[in-house]
């Protein structure tokens, strides 16, 4: 994989190349003196003379080679061969390596940044540093790292951790066009298309062409070019059509007729050479081979005894072209071979009037050879030399042809690295593009690669080409998706899209070796199929595996169908296997692909599949052994995504909790560090590993009771999470995702502490105090003995309660571990976040933590309520009621309800917060309408605040709360759900119990009917608001049944059918939907039909039954038989004691057994909020019996 900085290196080279290309135009002003130019010309002339002599020797050798090969192949063309051991040195040993060639007067002046070689080594005018045609990571050819898949991108994934399509979009820099001056202009345009795409404009047609039948192997040639000379690599798009080696654009006063697009993956140049035809016989077609020499041990050594084919477009050909090649009757041209094997020249299409000038030679300078000199042998994991699975080069047909056309040299196909040992690439009909006459094949455009791939249909166009069935000449039109190609045809009599135009004289051509071996679709730009990519994950080369994983990551981004298909094809197992790979890049890309595959709520199957193939242990192994920050970030990101699946949570807790805590949480939090310096603070605040891990723990903390127990008992976890919050509070980092995750995790771990933590039970439940403003129901030392009351000594305040001042009873030492969850010291950071943070999730989590901690009758819940009052937290909570965020208001309202369990808190809330609570009720000009859950929470807070406090009840009436509550219960305005109606009816019922206030109510126009809502009305409203209920349920409704009396109603008596338990999978917030209301059906005494609307909410029916029997006649008469047996709405409230007396004198005489939640039918479990997971866990009502602080 290319490093991220690779892109910047390429981009840096582009402007310079454009400058070079632009500076070669004929309109440039000379920049050097005439003396310097003349000196340069003389020096060039001396070199050209020497080159002319060498080229004459080459011409003789090439002529004999061409004749022999043509006869051997029994065809009018000859095949080119690539060298195996030696290559021709293009300069003698006595000539220095480099030199500066001065510009000449006769042509456009060369800029000074062109370092032209002064010996025959002149090849191109650019070096790897100037353009992107360098063999660096990700480039095609013999790359050093070869981590790029040949068929995709030369830039690759710049960032393996990213899974956004946009990171690999082609660089659309709208590069300037380079015009090539001549009788007609040929343009190579670099537009905003993907890297490597080129636009070639043909100008002259019907040129009989020679064919270069084979291009040497990529292992030997890093910069092979085809056809018109356009270089294949990304930077080559700014090169000249007249260059045989992809040099920058040159001044070329001849008409050009490019016949094919360039390709970095094209195995052979299917182009013709104008040098090979005579004007009298334009249809004579010959094949020019690039017969290169064998490599010598000394690349700079003297010229060997034989030279190879005419390298049209090479600088060494140009001098001879002035004297010999310029004549259209010249048959063949001698040329020296490249410095190293495999350098293939590209024939040019020249008009009969062309005279190539000395200036052309300067355009082929040192830079191409700089590339060769910088090349190293291919590394073992590169794709060079890999045998193709389309047609093995060891096939009998291929061997025969090689022996025929190349008797003494072995041909290595250039595109052997294109395909892999995968049967999916095999095709029953291999073909090639065989064109007749002057037609050439349109092979492939653009440099290929993942990095520039965009998975949109607009990136492709369909071009047709011919397919030959191996060596047969039967052709068929075949359509294949290509990368979009922009071109214009100018006055040419052949069609690029229809390559079946017959030859001028009908000459039949035999296919080349590559034409026989390769399927043309292999050279066309196409997306690999998903099975192919998954198969590449098992490739023997790490580069292929890395790129296949990166491509999967790219494909899976935002595409659930692809994710499911990858899982079905077994790709997850292969990716998990790559996690143990020794190559870092493979590990990164595998993690990135897995992270995308398991992202989203609809990928639970992928998450389960990853768990089943051992993905979690593999991730943990990689996390423990890797020191690379990016790998650790990716691993924890995968675990975070996995943790959102309920079926995987416990596996992660069992296998990964300890590792995550000890490897990430504790070290990154700084909890165990003696000094927490500024550098660590910066690292801590920007740690993506810590963010991902805390997000994973946040999901795991909602997996249920067992998960919470294991997380609480994990050493260092609670301490580190709280330390993170303290640190962020001290550094004013209130809104980060890490803080949010920590707060929400602690909120879930604070759920039901007194029942799930043994230490909490020992510390708090055995010591019942009267912190609620009432006496303990038991005067005995044993809490389980209720009948026998034993006198005890009156405890001092320091022994049995804590009002927020002084030492905390029961905690003599500094808390640690799980004890820190309920210690009153946690209140301050929570309140700080509530006051300072602007992140709604953090606000909700902090309020929810206080809500959970203040719930219950145990001692530390009372301590928390006192600590909130001491830290001035009540005004902070009340102010948050005004937020326009539904979930924050719901959490804050429930927290206020729990805070009101403390007598002093209740007085403060009634005095200062009553109007804010009433304003959030529907109606009036208050903020936006809230959800039913939030409305029910506000009503429950009002109910608790007004219970046993007449002053607060009067404040509610004065603030206009009665009107809003009556509108809810009577169904006026927007119809509220049954849950809200019941909660509002409870508040009204509580208000009516204060007899001293009834006169005030009547003055305001209210009577008993407004405060006491019949159950039948609730039932009727319920069916009106839920029209989806079936008529069967309505017929079975208790409304139309005769039920005896209300005294026998199991709802009012608290008798619950043992079968009427909520299903464990039912989320607590879905109890009152249109279907959930009819979920639990059970027979009740005194009725011959089951009630379809039996909602269970009792936690201790026996105690409730005894209490309700005493007050069953309070509101209903015995003869009222049409009452709903519906237990969620209670009208059996105990009347306040002695209303005529001062209320607060009697408040301490209420027995604790008359707890408020069961008294008013409030559900017990949902007072604790546990919502921070993908799916909220469910808890049955009976899991938390006897809670005094649960809400509806």
UniProtKB/Swiss-Prot annotation:
A single Gene Ontology MF term assigned here is:
cadherin binding
Job of this protein: Plays a role as a regulator of Rho activity during cytokinesis. May play a role in junctional plaques.
Question: Quick one: a GO biological-process term for this protein?
Answer: cell-cell junction assembly
Residues that bear Phosphothreonine:
84, 412, 1013, 1017
Residue ranges with Basic and acidic residues bias = 773-782
What protein name does the entry list?
Plakophilin-4
Describe the subunit structure.
Interacts with PDZD2. Interacts (via the C-terminus) with FRMPD2 (via the PDZ 2 domain). Interacts with RHOA; the interaction is detected at the midbody. Interacts with ECT2; the interaction is detected at the midbody. Interacts with CCDC85B.
Question: At which residues is Phosphoserine found?
Answer: 75, 106, 132, 136, 139, 221, 231, 236, 273, 281, 314, 327, 337, 392, 403, 406, 422, 427, 438, 510, 512, 515, 776, 1045, 1091, 1100, 1135
Q: Fetch the Pfam families from UniProt.
A: Arm (PF00514)
Where does this one sit in the cell?
Cell junction, Desmosome; Cytoplasm, Cytoskeleton, Spindle; Midbody; Cell membrane
**Could you tell me in which tissues this protein is expressed?**
Expressed in salivary glands (at protein level). Expressed in arrector pili muscle (at protein level).
- Cellular component per GO? adherens junction; cell junction; cell-cell junction; cornified envelope; cytoplasm; cytoplasmic side of plasma membrane; cytoskeleton; desmosome
Q: Which SMART domains match?
A: ARM
Repeat (ARM) residue spans along the chain: 415-455, 518-557, 560-599, 604-644, 660-702, 706-751, 815-855, 862-901, 950-993
Q: Which domain of life, per UniProt?
A: Eukaryota
User: Where would one find coiled-coil regions in this protein?
Assistant: 36-70
Positions bearing Phosphotyrosine: 372, 415, 478
Biased-composition ranges, Polar residues, are 77-86, 138-156, 163-204, 214-230, 1067-1077
Q: How does it sit in the membrane?
A: Peripheral membrane protein
User: What keywords were assigned to this record?
Assistant: Cell adhesion, Cell junction, Cell membrane, Coiled coil, Cytoplasm, Cytoskeleton, Membrane, Methylation, Phosphoprotein, Repeat
Q: Which family does it belong to?
A: Belongs to the beta-catenin family.
Locate the compositionally biased regions of type Low complexity: 231-242, 325-338
């Amino acid at each position: 994989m290319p490093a991220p900085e690779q892109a910047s290196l390429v981009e840096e080279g582009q402007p310079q190349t454009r400058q070079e290309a632009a500076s070669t135009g004929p309109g440039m002003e000379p920049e050097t003196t005439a003396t310097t130019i003349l000196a340069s010309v003389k020096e060039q002339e001396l070199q050209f003379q020497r080159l002319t002599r060498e080229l004459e020797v080459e011409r003789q050798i090439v002529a004999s080679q061409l004749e022999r090969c043509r006869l051997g192949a029994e065809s009018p063309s000859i095949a080119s061969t690539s060298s195996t051991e030696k290559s021709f040195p293009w300069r003698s040993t006595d000539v220095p390596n480099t030199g500066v060639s001065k510009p000449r007067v006769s042509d456009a002046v060369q800029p000074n940044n062109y370092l032209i070689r002064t010996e025959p080594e002149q090849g191109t005018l650019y070096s790897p540093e100037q353009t992107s045609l360098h063999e660096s990571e990700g480039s095609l050819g013999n790359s050093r790292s070869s981590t790029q898949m040949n068929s995709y991108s030369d830039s690759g994934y710049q960032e393996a951790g990213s899974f956004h399509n946009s990171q690999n979009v082609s660089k659309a820099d709208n590069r300037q066009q380079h015009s090539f001056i001549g009788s007609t202009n040929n343009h190579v345009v670099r537009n905003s298309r993907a890297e490597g795409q080129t636009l070639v404009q043909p100008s002259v047609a019907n040129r009989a062409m020679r064919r270069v039948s084979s291009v040497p192997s990529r292992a030997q040639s890093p910069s092979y070019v085809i056809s018109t000379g356009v270089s294949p690599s990304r930077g080559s798009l700014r090169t000249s059509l007249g260059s045989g080696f992809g040099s920058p654009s040159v001044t070329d006063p001849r008409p050009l007729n490019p016949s094919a697009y360039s390709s970095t993956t094209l195995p052979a140049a299917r182009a013709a050479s104008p040098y090979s035809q005579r004007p009298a016989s334009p249809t004579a077609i010959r094949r020019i081979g690039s017969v290169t020499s064998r490599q010598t041990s000394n690349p700079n050594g003297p010229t060997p005894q034989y030279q190879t084919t005419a390298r049209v477009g090479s600088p060494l050909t140009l001098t001879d072209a002035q004297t010999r090649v310029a004549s259209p009757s010249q048959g063949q041209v001698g040329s020296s071979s490249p410095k190293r094997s495999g350098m293939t020249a590209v024939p040019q299409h020249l008009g009969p009037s062309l005279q190539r000038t000395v200036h052309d030679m300067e355009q082929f300078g040192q830079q191409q050879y700089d590339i060769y000199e910088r090349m190293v042998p291919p590394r073992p994991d590169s794709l060079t030399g890999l045998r193709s699975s389309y047609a093995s080069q060891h096939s009998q047909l291929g061997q025969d042809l090689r022996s025929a056309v190349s008797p003494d040299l072995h041909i290595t196909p250039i595109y052997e690295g294109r395909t892999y040992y995968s049967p999916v690439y095999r095709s029953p009909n291999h073909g090639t593009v065989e064109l007749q006459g002057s037609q050439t094949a349109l092979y492939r455009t653009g440099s290929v690669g993942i990095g520039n791939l965009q998975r949109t249909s607009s990136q492709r166009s369909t071009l047709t080409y011919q397919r030959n069935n191996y060596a047969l000449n039967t052709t068929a039109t075949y359509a294949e998706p290509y990368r979009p190609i922009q071109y214009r045809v100018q006055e040419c009599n052949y069609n690029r899209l229809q390559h079946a135009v017959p030859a001028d004289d009908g000459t039949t051509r035999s296919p080349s070796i590559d034409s026989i071996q390769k399927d043309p679709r292999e050279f066309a730009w196409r997306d690999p199929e998903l099975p192919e990519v998954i198969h590449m994950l098992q490739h023997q080369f790490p580069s292929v595996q890395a790129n296949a994983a990166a491509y999967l990551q790219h494909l899976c981004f935002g595409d659930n169908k692809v994710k499911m298909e990858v899982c079905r094809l077994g790709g997850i197992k292969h990716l998990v296997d790559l996690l143990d790979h020794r190559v870092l890049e493979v590990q990164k890309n595998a993690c990135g692909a897995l992270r995308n595959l398991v992202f989203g709520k609809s990928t639970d199957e992928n998450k389960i599949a990853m768990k089943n193939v051992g993905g979690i242990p593999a991730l943990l192994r990689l996390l423990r052994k890797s020191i690379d920050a990016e790998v650790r970030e990716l691993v924890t990101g995968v675990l975070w995504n996995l943790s959102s699946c309920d079926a995987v949570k416990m596996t992660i807790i069992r296998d990964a909790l300890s590792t995550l805590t000890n490897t990430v949480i504790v070290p990154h939090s700084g909890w165990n560090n003696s000094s927490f310096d500024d550098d660590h603070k910066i690292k801590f605040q920007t740690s993506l590993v810590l963010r991902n891990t805390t997000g994973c723990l946040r999901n795991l903390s909602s997996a249920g009771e067992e998960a919470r127990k294991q997380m609480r008992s994990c050493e260092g976890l609670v301490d580190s999470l709280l330390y993170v919050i303290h640190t962020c509070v001290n550094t004013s980092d209130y809104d980060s995702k890490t803080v949010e995750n920590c707060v929400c995790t602690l909120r879930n771990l604070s759920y039901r502490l007194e029942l799930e933590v043994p230490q909490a039970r020992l510390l708090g439940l055995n010591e019942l105090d009267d912190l609620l403003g009432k006496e303990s129901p038991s005067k005995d030392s044993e809490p389980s003995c209720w009948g026998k009351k034993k006198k005890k000594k009156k405890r001092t305040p320091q022994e049995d309660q804590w009002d927020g001042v002084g030492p905390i009873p029961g905690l003599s030492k500094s808390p640690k571990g799980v004890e820190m969850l309920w210690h009153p010291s946690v209140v301050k950071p929570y309140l700080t976040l509530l006051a300072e943070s602007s992140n709604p999730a953090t606000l909700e989590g902090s309020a929810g933590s206080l809500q959970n901690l203040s719930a219950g009758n145990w001692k530390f819940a009372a301590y928390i309520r006192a600590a909130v009052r001491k830290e001035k937290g009540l005004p902070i909570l009340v102010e948050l009621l005004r937020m326009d965020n539904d979930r924050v208001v719901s959490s804050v309202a429930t927290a206020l309800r729990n805070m009101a369990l403390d007598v002093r808190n209740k007085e403060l809330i009634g005095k200062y917060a009553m109007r804010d609570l009433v304003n959030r009720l529907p109606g009036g000009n208050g903020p936006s309408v809230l959800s039913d859950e939030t409305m029910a929470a506000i009503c429950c807070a009002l109910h608790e605040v007004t219970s046993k406090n007449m002053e607060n009840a009067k404040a509610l009436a004065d603030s206009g709360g009665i009107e809003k509550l009556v509108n809810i219960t009577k169904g006026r305005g927007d119809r509220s759900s049954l849950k809200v109606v019941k909660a509002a009816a409870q508040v009204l019922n509580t208000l009516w119990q204060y007899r001293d206030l009834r006169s005030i109510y009547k003055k305001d126009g209210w009577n008993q009917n407004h405060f006491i809502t019949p159950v039948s009305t609730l039932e009727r409203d319920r069916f009106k608001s839920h029209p989806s209920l079936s008529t069967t349920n309505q017929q079975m409704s208790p409304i139309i049944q005769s039920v005896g009396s209300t005294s026998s109603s199991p709802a009012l008596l608290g008798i619950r059918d043992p079968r009427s338990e909520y299903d464990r999978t039912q989320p607590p917030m879905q109890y009152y939907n249109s279907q959930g209301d009819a979920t639990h059906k059970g027979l009740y005494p005194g009725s011959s039909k089951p009630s379809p609307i039996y909602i269970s909410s009792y936690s201790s029916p026996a105690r409730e039954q005894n209490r309700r029997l005493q007050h069953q006649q309070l509101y209903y008469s015995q003869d009222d038989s049409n009452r709903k047996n519906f237990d969620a709405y209670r009208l059996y409230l105990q009347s306040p004691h002695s209303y005529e007396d001062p209320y607060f004198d009697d408040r301490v005489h209420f027995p604790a057994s008359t707890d408020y939640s069961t008294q008013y039918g409030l559900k017990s479990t949902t007072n604790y909020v546990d919502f921070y997971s993908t799916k909220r866990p469910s808890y049955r009502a009976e899991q938390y019996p006897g809670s005094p602080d649960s809400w509806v």
